[in-house]
């Protein structure tokens, strides 16, 4: 989503609160909980899950391994739920032609550097760069080339934009910033 006026362009960036992350977190939580319950039921020799009789699983070595996988999956699932709740990666890109400043803001993990803010002068922007990698895992990424600082990505690597969409976005941004476009 973006908002534009004559002098300001604000591009909102979606973070980790995506449907795919929710689905993976739920699937991982339920699967690892199932593994852990089967491992515990093999240790207790009771059926904690009625669909699967615990007598078929010996605690050593299958029950221990399933318990370990269940715990590992719960840790990974809790990590996913934390990134979703903190909305890591979300933020905005603000281009202000009137003041000549570009602000790139992202939310990070809690701690000292939770808020990530880059402030740049528009005069330091060399170009808008499109990087295209075709093949099995094709990706198209939009970068802003800065003098002395390298390239700053403006789109996510998992954002699957069509060639037409990325070209249009690059052309509009380059026109707004009055800089050239480079394609790699």
UniProtKB/Swiss-Prot annotation:
Its membrane topology is listed as: Multi-pass membrane protein
Any matching Pfam family: Ycf4
UniProt entry keywords in alphabetical sequence: Chloroplast, Membrane, Photosynthesis, Plastid, Thylakoid, Transmembrane, Transmembrane helix
Q: Name one GO cellular component term.
A: photosystem I
* Lineage top rank: taxon: Eukaryota
Q: What is its main location?
A: plastid
Q: Which BP terms from GO are recorded?
A: photosynthesis
Q: Which InterPro entries match?
A: PSI_Ycf4_assembly
Residue ranges crossing the lipid bilayer per the database entry: 22-42, 57-77
Record's subcellular location: Plastid, Chloroplast thylakoid membrane
- Give the protein's function: Seems to be required for the assembly of the photosystem I complex.
Regarding protein family, the annotation reads: Belongs to the Ycf4 family.
Protein name per UniProt: Photosystem I assembly protein Ycf4
Organism encoding this protein = Populus trichocarpa (Western balsam poplar)
